[in-house]
Regions:
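Rossmann-like dinucleotide-binding domain for NAD(H)/NADP(H)
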Residues: 3-100
């Protein structure tokens, strides 16, 4: 990676090697990082990444916004109604055998 690169992980803890990231940030191999999930959650207070000033961290709640909560509720309710009306999109169902 270029020294101007930023690593961002909003997916799952463990995707990014936290020890390697710490060293890359501390040694200036990359410019910065933004991390939402950690391998251990909640991340311990003594997590070495917390000592650095070129990283932004959040407690794995970056997706918890008013809009996301509204949309989760809306789509859950819509799928229930669609199911009862026989209009549920089968692509949204993991265990399709329950539809028959």
């Amino acid at each position: 990676m270029k020294p101007t690169a930023f690593v961002v992980n909003t997916a799952r803890g463990g995707i990014v090697d936290e020890t390697a990231l710490y060293h890359a940030l501390k040694e200036g191999v990359i410019a910065g990082a933004g991390i939402d999930p950690f391998v251990l959650e909640p991340a311990p207070a003594d997590t070495p990444l917390f000592e650095l000033d070129n990283i932004i961290v959040s407690p794995h709640t970056a997706g918890v916004t008013e809009e996301s909560i509204y949309r989760m509720g809306y789509w859950a309710a819509k799928n229930v109604v669609d199911c009862f009306d026989g209009k549920l999109n089968p692509d949204n169902v993991i265990n399709k055998e329950v539809l028959s």
